[in-house]
C-alpha cells in the first residue's frame, strides 16, 4: 500500500510538517495532489483530505464534539466509563486504547481522569492524533486532560506483547474497524468513509484480543456495533448493551477461573 503523502499548505509550519513526516514515515510533497487521499497541514490543524465528496477528517480534543463531551458527557455513568470499570472506582485505571483511531474514546476516558495510552499502527491516524494532542496541550481548557494522554505509534499486538510486568495496563480497550455492511450507517458517517478507506479494516482482531487478554491486569473491553458479532476465539465474561453500540467485557479473573 502506497504511503499517504503530507502536503504543507502553510509555509510557516514547514518544520512541523517535516517533524511529522520523520516521526511517522510519511512522504512530504510540494504540491497539493490532484486526486487520491493526502494529509494537509494548514494554519490550524492537520487534516486527511480527498478530491471526492468526503469532508476533511481530523482528530479534535478541544472544540466541537470534544468540547461537548468534556462539558456535558455524562461522567462515570456513560457507557464507555461503565465498561472500563469507572463507576464507583476509587483508583482510576491505566487504559491502553489498542485501536486509538481518532482518539474519541481515549479522550473521554482521559477527561474522566484515566491515564490513557493511545496505540495506533496507522501512520495517518497516528499523525492526526499527534497533531490533536499538541493542540490540546497548548489550550488551557484541555492541557490537564492531554497530560494524561500518551501516543504510541506501533502495532498493538507487538506493543502489548513487549510490555514488562510493571508496564501492563489495567484495562485494554479495543474498537476494531470492521468492513461496514450497513449502508445507512455508512451514509451517516461520511467523514469516516475516507478514514476507513485509508486506514483499512482490522483483519487480525482475534489475535489482538488474545494479546490484550494476556497483557491486561483487570479487563479487556471490546466496543462493537450493538448487533455485530463478537470477536471469535474467547466468549465475553459480560456484555454491556447501549443504544447503537455494546461493550463485550473480558474480565481477567473470570477468564482465569473459567
Swiss-Prot record:
A GO molecular function assigned to this protein is:
rRNA (guanine-N2-)-methyltransferase activity
Report the subcellular localization: Cytoplasm
Indicate yes or no for the key word Transferase.
yes
Enumerate the UniProt keywords alphabetically: Cytoplasm, Methyltransferase, rRNA processing, S-adenosyl-L-methionine, Transferase
CDD domains to which the protein is assigned, alphabetical: AdoMet_MTases
Give EC number(s), comma-separated.
2.1.1.242
Name the cystine pairs: none
The residues the entry assigns to the signal sequence are none
Top-level EC class as recorded in UniProt: transferase
The answer to whether keyword S-adenosyl-L-methionine applies is yes
Reactions catalysed = guanosine(1516) in 16S rRNA + S-adenosyl-L-methionine = N(2)-methylguanosine(1516) in 16S rRNA + S-adenosyl-L-homocysteine + H(+)
> Gene3D superfamilies, alphabetically?
Vaccinia Virus protein VP39
Q: Major place of localization? A: cytoplasm
- A single Pfam family it belongs to is SAM_MT
UniProt superkingdom: Bacteria
Q: Where does S-adenosyl-L-methionine bind?
A: 104-105, 120-121, 175
* GO cellular component terms, A-Z: cytoplasm
What InterPro entries would the database entry show?
A: 16SrRNA_methylTrfase_J, SAM-dependent_MTases_sf
Assigned protein family: Belongs to the methyltransferase superfamily. RsmJ family.
Q: Which HAMAP family match?
A: 16SrRNA_methyltr_J
Role this protein plays: Specifically methylates the guanosine in position 1516 of 16S rRNA.
Record protein name field? Ribosomal RNA small subunit methyltransferase J
Amino acid at each position: 500500500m502506497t504511503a499517504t503523502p503530507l502536503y504543507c499548505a502553510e509555509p510557516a509550519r514547514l518544520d512541523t510538517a517535516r517533524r511529522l513526516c520523520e516521526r511517522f514515515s510519511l512522504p512530504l510533497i510540494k504540491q497539493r495532489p490532484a486526486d487520491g487521499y493526502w494529509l494537509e497541514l494548514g494554519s490550524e490543524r492537520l487534516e486527511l483530505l480527498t478530491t471526492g465528496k468526503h469532508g476533511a477528517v481530523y482528530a479534535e480534543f478541544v472544540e466541537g464534539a470534544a468540547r461537548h463531551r468534556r462539558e456535558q458527557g455524562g461522567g462515570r455513568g456513560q457507557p464507555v466509563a461503565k465498561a472500563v470499570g469507572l463507576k464507583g472506582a476509587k483508583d482510576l485505571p491505566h487504559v491502553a486504547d489498542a485501536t486509538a483511531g481518532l482518539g474519541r474514546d481515549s479522550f473521554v476516558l482521559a477527561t474522566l481522569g484515566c491515564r490513557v495510552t493511545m496505540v495506533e499502527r496507522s501512520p495517518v491516524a497516528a499523525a492526526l492524533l499527534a497533531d490533536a494532542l499538541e493542540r490540546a496541550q497548548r489550550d488551557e481548557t484541555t492541557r490537564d486532560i492531554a497530560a494524561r494522554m500518551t501516543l504510541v505509534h506501533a502495532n498493538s499486538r507487538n506493543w502489548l506483547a513487549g510490555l514488562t510486568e510493571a508496564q501492563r495496563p489495567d484495562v485494554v480497550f479495543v474498537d476494531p474497524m470492521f468492513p461496514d455492511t450497513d449502508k445507512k450507517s455508512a451514509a451517516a458517517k461520511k467523514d469516516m468513509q475516507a478514514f476507513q478507506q485509508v486506514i483499512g479494516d482490522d483483519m487480525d482482531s482475534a489475535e489482538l484480543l488474545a494479546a490484550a487478554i494476556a497483557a491486561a491486569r483487570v479487563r479487556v473491553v471490546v466496543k462493537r456495533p450493538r448487533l455485530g458479532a463478537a470477536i471469535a476465539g474467547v466468549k465475553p465474561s459480560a456484555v454491556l448493551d447501549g443504544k447503537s453500540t455494546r461493550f463485550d467485557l473480558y474480565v481477567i479473573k473470570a477468564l482465569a477461573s473459567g
